[in-house]
């Protein structure tokens, strides 16, 4: 009986584990694969009607299908799923997490480290551009299907798309926890429908399966040498969203994402692309919208509805990704602090950042109004996608060679293969800059300027403050000679440098001429890792005479809650009772000057960013009634 019971318990646990794995797989499909899953809506349409001159004939169709298939296998299956997903930063992925990893890998090489940071900022900047383009092109392409069902409705495509998109951004503040539970089942349904449509199309023209032979892709380049590289600018549309596999790894882990790709997503995508190809072999005129024309006429309206839901889910994924990327960038010091709201009491990762939300919404609305169709927007899409992919490969190269210590004889050929393919795709999209691709380049350029100015400005600000800093040991020696009046309680002074006297402490002494019985110089350290365990959160050093130095360590995914962290400082001599603790902050006002380090116009830009950034009070969750803020002017 005992043996039977243990078998029953083991079986129950096994069922629970299987159910959890299935749940994670379905959830990953809903969040991770929305973008790449909606690519069949517009990829082949853009290839054959986007002005590339690709003939809709036997060789042209098979050549393009072979290019799409082997691009999916090389870039997504091999590069991302089997390789890039292993380059996690303690389970976290994405551009900022990878930049932090590359920064650590190149710590001994300052110039190379700077280059890695620049690549990371470029990748992040292009991701924000992608976060505007994805909702616009996806929803437009879905709604355009209505034009096939109803005559004369084409002029309603833009207004309907705008209503859907604006509504999506308006609900962000309230969170998507409830409706988010439907994302997985809806996207699973979407991929099943993709596969079913593809099987139906292939059954009408099975010869399309010849495209599995990579020789057709090679043949396309041979027959169309002038068109070969250029057409990659449209083929890459089949790969949009590949970066999401890596960016969302922290939510689901590598295995559920990989399993979902190989079990459901990849087969469904390949079947659908081949089904569309089979349709084009039978009816070349279907190139105007092969996705929707692949469906029976009775299924057109339900398919438009399902496609619209799928594109909204894809849009939600990149919006959430932009929020997550912003939080990481703030913690790592690349973006000014902004107000971050949590939209779920259970999920720490579900956040809302108003400034990012409204900026994205304005960008998306302008894109829809300006471009009016998914085909026109497709030109802008490839630049952002391929640029981000290229930056990811460069960052991974540094991690692979310098942190993982892979033998160059193994690593270099592999990395050269990745860089060669990424470089080809990027080169194919460069000419598109004048055809609409300028948008992500300009948006990325502006964001890169803002992030680099903020990072450099903060460095110069700390240097200027440090120039006249009074060493802490000297200060403590002086108060031993002339002791000031001491009052009960603990004074916490936030400072970037823990071995010097903060300006706020000097100002307090100058104006109030008192010191608290306990004086804590607190430095918050942002680490190049996602989370810091509680037992590694703090370092405490006692200087005597009631002076203490405390270092608090936070990862870029941690909530920097200073009062909560200080409660962990178990030291007999140190008292952080809330009503006996006062926090002293220094508020710097920057004045741009002609001093070395930064041009005057960038100095003014940094001053503007600093003025509008969220202060330490909110960012560190300090109690409003226990904070004193003292101002100081700094020239940079």
Curated annotation (Swiss-Prot):
Any single GO CC term annotated in Swiss-Prot or TrEMBL for this entry: plasma membrane
GO MF entries: potassium ion transmembrane transporter activity; symporter activity
UniProt keyword Transmembrane helix present: yes
Tree of life domain: Bacteria
Subcellular location(s) of the protein: Cell inner membrane
Membrane topology: Multi-pass membrane protein
Transmembrane segment boundaries: 22-42, 64-84, 115-135, 150-170, 182-202, 220-240, 261-281, 293-313, 351-371, 383-403, 408-428, 433-453
Entry keyword set: Cell inner membrane, Cell membrane, Ion transport, Membrane, Potassium, Potassium transport, Symport, Transmembrane, Transmembrane helix, Transport
Entry-linked InterPro entries: K+_transporter, K_trans_C, K_trans_N, Kup
One Pfam family hit: K_trans
Catalytic activity: K(+)(in) + H(+)(in) = K(+)(out) + H(+)(out)
Function of the molecule: Transport of potassium into the cell. Likely operates as a K(+):H(+) symporter.
Entry's family note: Belongs to the HAK/KUP transporter (TC 2.A.72) family.
Protein name: Probable potassium transport system protein Kup
Organism (species): Pseudomonas putida (strain GB-1)
Lineage: Bacteria, Pseudomonadati, Pseudomonadota, Gammaproteobacteria, Pseudomonadales
